[in-house]
A protein has these predicted regions:
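Membrane-interface helix-loop junctions in multi-pass transporters/channels
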Residues: 1-123
């Protein structure tokens, strides 16, 4: 149990650090209305989970490290929800709906692409 917990913690720490770095890099180059950093990390996280589902499905310790840990730390549903709420509170209803629906649909597509690619890489 301790080994599994350490794998999740290590992956989560790395994923959280990567999310933070991604947000910093994107903030330097983007100042638009859509919270791009959250959208990017969530879509990339969905893609990675899709890819890793196929590549790590039979290996419990890799699933814990990469899917539960890294992707769990890298993606952020709570920030997505808070940003959506802020848009709604500010009256930006169209932007909020676009962000919410777009995030979910693009995330599902990214996950599907990841699963598809995993089947090509490791049939």
């Amino acid at each position: 149990m301790l080994r599994q917990l350490l794998l999740v913690a290590l992956g989560g720490a790395l994923g959280s650090a990567m999310r933070y770095l991604t947000a910093i890099l994107l903030a330097r180059h983007y100042t638009g209305s859509i919270p791009l950093a959250t959208l990017v990390v969530n879509v990339l996280g969905c893609f990675l989970i899709g890819l890793l589902i196929g590549l790590c499905n039979d290996t419990a310790h890799l699933r814990l490290l990469f899917i539960t840990g890294f992707c769990g730390g890298f993606t952020t549903f709570s920030t997505f929800t808070a940003e959506s709420y802020a848009m709604l509170r500010e009256g930006a209803y169209g932007l909020a709906i676009l962000y919410i629906v777009g995030s979910v649909l693009i995330g599902l597509l990214a996950l599907w692409v990841g699963v598809y690619l995993s089947r090509i890489i490791a049939p």
